[in-house]
Amino acid sequence: MRLTAKQVIWLKVCLHLAGLLPFLWLVWAINHGGLGADPVKDIQHFTGRTALKFLLAALLITPLARYAKQPLLIRTRRLLGLWCFAWATLHLTSYALLELGVNNLALLGKELITRPYLTLGIISWVILLALAFTSTQSMQRKLGKHWQQLHNFVYLVAILAPIHYLWSVKIISPQPLMYAGLAVLLLALRYKKLLSLFNRLRKQAHNKLSL
């Protein structure tokens, strides 16, 4: 049985709750000692993992809608992407304010450049910012064919974000490996599209070099 438009609306409500409840839990944990011995790191990792969860969920929607024959499920993809951006912004903010501190924000640019894992993180965030800003139907109409070209960069985020997570932890544990594995799986489901994109980019680069 296919989802109806009304059911999709309720699904979106549930997804909003899924995006909001972790924030409420985090606020509670901060105020009631629910974090570990290093609360700053715990906050950074929690916000980063939550952003990654929404990224993977957004990437899951297209193959799920195709294989389950639920075309209306695509309507939830933008919502998941926006929650991914929101949590990624919280992740960046927690690093800037809690790790560096308000008095050392001038060091942020240097940190992002000199630490490779942070460089990957900020590249991912900038891409997510662009995708969030252009996610509306009006921007889709305005950008035309370039809209899809821009939003294909989500696949780059799906590569960079798990590497950023793996690189940021001092001891490799099953959790970051699990996220990386899921990202690889979701990208593998799109191997034909990704191969086509790669060949197109290679052809464009070759044509420019030939001029």
Swiss-Prot record:
Annotated GO MF terms: electron transfer activity; FMN binding; heme binding; metal ion binding; oxidoreductase activity, acting on diphenols and related substances as donors
Cofactor: binding comment: Binds 1 FMN per subunit.
Bilayer disposition of the protein: Multi-pass membrane protein
Record localization: Cell inner membrane
Transmembrane region(s): 8-28, 54-74, 82-102, 116-136, 153-173
Cofactor(s) listed in the protein's UniProt record: FMN; heme b
Keywords, ordered alphabetically: Cell inner membrane, Cell membrane, Electron transport, Flavoprotein, FMN, Heme, Iron, Membrane, Metal-binding, Transmembrane, Transmembrane helix, Transport
Gene Ontology biological process terms from the UniProt entry: protein repair
Keyword Heme attributed: yes
GO cellular component, one term: plasma membrane
Primary location group: membrane
InterPro entries named in the record: Fe3_Rdtase_TM_dom (IPR013130), MsrQ-like (IPR022837)
Source superkingdom: Bacteria
Coiled coil start-end: none
Subunit details: Heterodimer of a catalytic subunit (MsrP) and a heme-binding subunit (MsrQ).
Function: Part of the MsrPQ system that repairs oxidized periplasmic proteins containing methionine sulfoxide residues (Met-O), using respiratory chain electrons. Thus protects these proteins from oxidative-stress damage caused by reactive species of oxygen and chlorine generated by the host defense mechanisms. MsrPQ is essential for the maintenance of envelope integrity under bleach stress, rescuing a wide series of structurally unrelated periplasmic proteins from methionine oxidation, including the primary periplasmic chaperone SurA and the lipoprotein Pal.
Family as reported in the entry's similarity comment: Belongs to the MsrQ family.
Protein name: Protein-methionine-sulfoxide reductase heme-binding subunit MsrQ
